[in-house]
From Swiss-Prot:
Catalyzes the synthesis of alpha-ribazole-5'-phosphate from nicotinate mononucleotide (NAMN) and 5,6-dimethylbenzimidazole (DMB). The keyword Endoplasmic reticulum does not apply. It is an enzyme of class 2 (transferase). Its EC number is 2.4.2.21. It holds the Pfam family DBI_PRT. NCBIfam families: cobT_DBIPRT, PRK00105.1. This is Nicotinate-nucleotide--dimethylbenzimidazole phosphoribosyltransferase. Belongs to the CobT family. The active site is at 312 (proton acceptor). Keywords: Cobalamin biosynthesis, Glycosyltransferase, Transferase. Transmembrane segments: none annotated.
Amino acid sequence: MKNFHIEYPDEGLREALIDKINNLTKPKGSLGVLEDLALQIGLIQQTLSPTLSHPHNVLFAADHGIVEEGVSKSPKEITWQQLSNFLHGGAGVNFLCRQHGFKLVLVDSGVDYDLPYEKGIINCSVGRGTHSFLKGPAMSMEEMELCLERGAKITDMIHADGCNVVSFGEMGIGNTSPSSVWMHLLTGISLEQCVGAGSGLDSEGIRHKYNVLKQSVDHYAGDGSAKDIIAWFGGYEMVMAIGGMLRAAELRMIILVDGFIMTNCILAASKLHPEVLSYAIFGHQGDETGHKLVLDAMKVRPLLNLGLRLGEGTGAICAYPIVVSSVNMMNEMDNFAHASITKYF
């Protein structure tokens, strides 16, 4: 079993960071969220001069047994087909990774297909998709622990490559369903408010999806612990992302959080280790029903609101230039004393 030892960032540098930020050549607070990010990143890295190095987008992919209950508009083969598209550079996440200088890492967490691992997909498969959680647990506790361990190892790999800032993405037809159930059970928000259109369900489809998820929750026979809820309803790619996030926090890396799926992954991660949220920057508020509610429940502020609902890490990557600006502010702006400017506030 993988044990994580995550600490909150040391607060000893807080006053020095605030002093540096307040003495840059600008009115106090005038760079808003950039100043908040600079403080957070400075505390994570324990420095007055933070850096961003070798950004990676780790994309975990897996299939979901709940799809057999008709909860998704898209057939499950889209999972492997899109993974092939990622491999060949033709997806939304690909152009954004190219544009913003991210290295894309593709991981098979449990896709129900024979994938071409020799072409660059990392084989971390735990199985050929989860079971339908309408009928019982999606995965065993042993499988959940294996996912956490393998996700952590992927983070170790990119950290060894010099990465100190990582976004996590996902591909898994049906994965808004486990996300909605996690959100409901881990926050107490009504299930109806947590269920949305996913990849494009109409109102009738959303109602059917809700009914399936409601039956699944009603039939839940676990112990109610966070780990049990994660395993009973989760997806392999989602739990692997949790492992990746927890290890990233343990290594004091910056975690860029993407959309509805990944927000619920870090919600789940925070139920295991609350400290992980100190390392998280929330990239955007997506268009999926429930995303704003779960962000509000976690009391976090996303950087962007662009109506995105693609996943893959795309929203987190779109927000990255704002993170870069916050670091550049700390390293490139002059202070009042050095610039011989009277402090005017």
